[in-house]
């Protein structure tokens, strides 16, 4: 609850400025629409601006009154000044005082939630390690199954057109068969990864609940969103691996088909060139797939870091505490601010309701 109020003060001070600026530009825009309605529009715009500032002032005074338990005993809650500059300075002073008192609490909550999310990352790590090992084994398997170099192979390729055509057709069949076989091998790994995400994220929900400053409803939404994002990314990773194998099959098939056409025209066919092509294509498949698995692991880190900030914001001294309003896209920045405010209102409403319920029923937890 205390951490939420600190966030509210920080964001409300910005939000009041945004609202005032919005009313000013509405007032300015209305003045330029037509001279006939100018007087009436000026009056309406001025009333809108005044009402917006008065409402923001009222809201902020209400929040300052609720900071009583966090202040020194016997110290009356302040009333905000009536001028915008006075509001800004007074809010800044109050925010610094409350932030100092809440710093240890918020730091502890942020760290506790971070530990739980690190646990989730460690629980998912074996799945990606297993997947990378399977990629390496699959490349070795395909390398062996599609191997072309050997005394018998070279003699067959150089023995005549019919022998070379027969060997290349067999090679084409092996490419199709073994790439499809390897594709099937990856299905169980994808299923285990998706199942593991669902299971471990639910465990995270239970373990992080005592430490999150978010309301239970918002906590559930955040955890569900995390589960959906990671599940979608895991399925996308599986699709990418399947696509890589399709590309490997098509590239090798094309190369063999060109080689077959050359053999049919009695051109010489170098078995070493065919073997090198297979090796290079397999190395490219392994390299691309490793990068995609690494990107998936990085996505897990990014998503868990984001949810850590949502469930337990960092303390005021942390570089990520302040809202990012200096974004080049002002609409996106304001949208992010509005989303944070919506979350704060929900958490504050829950915190006040829970606190009021505890005060009215001091023995409610004991029966």
From Swiss-Prot:
Which stretches are annotated as coiled coil?
231-255
Q: Which residues form the signal peptide?
A: 1-20
PTM comment, free text: Phosphorylated by FAM20C in the extracellular medium.
Question: Which InterPro entries does UniProt cross-reference here?
Answer: ApoA_E, Apolipoprotein_A1/A4/E
Q: Which body tissues produce this protein?
A: Liver.
Stretches for region Disordered: 305-332
Name any one Pfam family assigned in the record.
Apolipoprotein
**Induction remark:** Induced in early phase of liver regeneration. Expression is maximally increased 6 hours after partial hepatectomy, both at the liver RNA level and at the plasma protein level.
**Where, per UniProt, does this protein localize?**
Secreted; Early endosome; Late endosome; Golgi apparatus, trans-Golgi network
Give the GO terms filed under biological process for this record: acylglycerol homeostasis; animal organ regeneration; cholesterol efflux; cholesterol homeostasis; cholesterol metabolic process; lipid transport; lipoprotein metabolic process; phospholipid efflux
SUPFAM superfamilies referenced in this protein's UniProt entry, alphabetically: Apolipoprotein A-I
Q: Which UniProt keywords apply?
A: Chylomicron, Coiled coil, Endosome, Golgi apparatus, HDL, Lipid transport, Phosphoprotein, Secreted, Signal, Transport, VLDL
MF (Gene Ontology): cholesterol transfer activity; enzyme activator activity; enzyme binding; heparin binding; lipase activator activity; lipase binding; lipid binding; lipoprotein lipase activator activity
Q: Which residues carry this modification: Phosphoserine?
A: 52
Q: Which GO terms describe its cellular component?
A: chylomicron; early endosome; extracellular region; extracellular space; extracellular vesicle; Golgi apparatus; high-density lipoprotein particle; late endosome
Describe its assembly: Interacts with GPIHBP1. Interacts with SORL1; this interaction leads to APOA5 internalization and sorting either to lysosomes and degradation, or to the trans-Golgi network.
The protein's role, per its UniProt record: Minor apolipoprotein mainly associated with HDL and to a lesser extent with VLDL. May also be associated with chylomicrons. Important determinant of plasma triglyceride (TG) levels by both being a potent stimulator of apo-CII lipoprotein lipase (LPL) TG hydrolysis and an inhibitor of the hepatic VLDL-TG production rate (without affecting the VLDL-apoB production rate). Activates poorly lecithin:cholesterol acyltransferase (LCAT) and does not enhance efflux of cholesterol from macrophages. Binds heparin.
Question: What family is this?
Answer: Belongs to the apolipoprotein A1/A4/E family.
How is this protein named in the record? Answer: Apolipoprotein A-V
Q: Which organism is it from?
A: Rattus norvegicus (Rat)
């Amino acid at each position: 609850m205390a951490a939420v109020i600190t966030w509210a003060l920080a964001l409300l001070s910005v939000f009041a400025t945004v609202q005032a600026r919005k009313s000013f530009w509405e007032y300015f825009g209305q003045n330029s629409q037509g001279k006939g309605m100018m007087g009436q529009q000026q009056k309406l715009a001025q009333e809108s601006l005044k009402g917006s500032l008065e409402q923001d002032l009222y809201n902020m005074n209400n929040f300052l009154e609720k900071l009583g338990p966090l202040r020194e005993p016997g110290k009356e809650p302040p009333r905000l000044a009536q001028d915008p500059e006075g509001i800004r300075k007074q809010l800044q002073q109050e925010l610094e005082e409350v932030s100092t008192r809440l710093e240890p609490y918020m730091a502890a909550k942020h760290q506790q939630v971070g530990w739980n999310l690190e646990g989730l990352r460690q629980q998912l790590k074996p799945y990606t390690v297993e997947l990378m090992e399977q990629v390496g084994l699959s490349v070795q398997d395909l390398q062996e199954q599609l191997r072309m170099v050997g005394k018998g192979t070279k003699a067959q390729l150089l023995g005549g057109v019919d022998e070379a055509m027969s060997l290349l057709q067999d090679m084409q069949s092996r490419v199709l068969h073994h790439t499809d076989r390897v594709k099937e091998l990856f299905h169980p790994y994808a299923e285990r990864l998706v199942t593991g995400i669902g299971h471990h994220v639910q465990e995270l929900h239970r373990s992080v609940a005592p430490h999150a400053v978010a309301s239970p409803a918002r906590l559930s939404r955040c955890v569900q969103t995390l589960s959906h994002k990671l599940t979608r990314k895991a399925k996308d990773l599986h699709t990418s691996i399947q696509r890589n194998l399709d590309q490997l099959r098509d590239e090798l098939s094309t190369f063999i088909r060109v080689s077959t056409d050359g053999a049919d025209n009695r051109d010489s066919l170098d078995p070493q060139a065919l073997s090198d092509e297979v090796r290079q294509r397999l190395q490219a498949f392994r390299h691309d797939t490793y990068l995609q698995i690494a990107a998936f692991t990085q996505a897990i880190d990014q998503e868990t870091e984001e949810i850590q900030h949502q469930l337990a914001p960092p303390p005021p001294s942390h570089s990520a505490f302040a809202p990012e309003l200096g974004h080049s896209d002002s609409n996106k920045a304001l949208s992010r601010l509005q989303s944070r405010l919506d979350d704060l209102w929900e958490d504050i409403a829950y915190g006040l309701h829970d606190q009021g319920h505890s005060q009215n029923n001091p023995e409610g937890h004991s029966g």
